[in-house]
Amino acid sequence: IAAGSLGGMSAMHEQTRGLNYIHHINQPHWFAAGGEEDREEFGVRIARELEAKRDELGEDKVAAFIAEPVQGAGGVIVPPDSYWPEIRRICEERDILLIMDEVICGFGRTGNWFGCETYDLKPDLMTFAKAVTNGYIPLGGVMVGNKVADVLLNHGGEFAHGLTYSGHPVACAAGLATLNILRDSKVIEHASSNIAPHFQARLAELRDHRIVGEVRGLGMFAAVELVRDKSSRERLAPDSQAAVFCRDTANDNGLMVRQTGDAMIMAPPLICNTAEIDILVDKLGEALDQTAAHYGVG
């Protein structure tokens, strides 16, 4: 219930009814909500909602702010450059703990080992999972910064964080093996320097497609937002039907993509080569052509 309440997926909130002590501010999704507003001004304005929410609730009611560096399942929402510096300022000035959810961004997805490094952030707590074992064995964890650890260890006794399967030797062995491969083979550095730039450049070519409203991405993941009209950002079809059609068409053509809302999401393996990236983008382009034809957009 707590995890569902923390996330931004409304279906989960409806299912669990949510927890009344968890509050949300708007996401820094400029394409969806920015209108004609300058992108960087939008980023600052949305970040300052944290400050306003803290004042609304009272300083003794706000323990922490938790977010992904880049929202993954929400649609690869890359925040404006102004967003995270303003969040960092607010957290530091208002003594709000910063918790980074690195489950998706962690271990190379944004071009660095962790997304917080990409945005020059030093979180007080950081969650991780997924790529720590390359997905072969379930493993997740929480990294605790000195600010929190010092209080727990020096003023509260033991750091009681054990769970039934904590430190499972098989899972931890898989994690260590994965980390060794990432480090010794320089997988992240190679992807960041050689593959990610090609991936983002090829996807950028789709911006001129007649049903593409926005192409956004960072490192080795990206999203393509579908629209009927580029100027008004009118959706191609209600209830994300067009995006579902595009996803299914891409799958039929041999390309696996994820659909979230009206966005097509891609997160190729870090070990891809440029030829495979070309296949990905070409197949997505074909799916976009078929989707445009299906909905009569010439």
What is the meaning of each model-derived region?
Residues I1-G298:
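Conserved N-terminal phosphate-binding loop of PLP-dependent enzymes in the Aspartate aminotransferase
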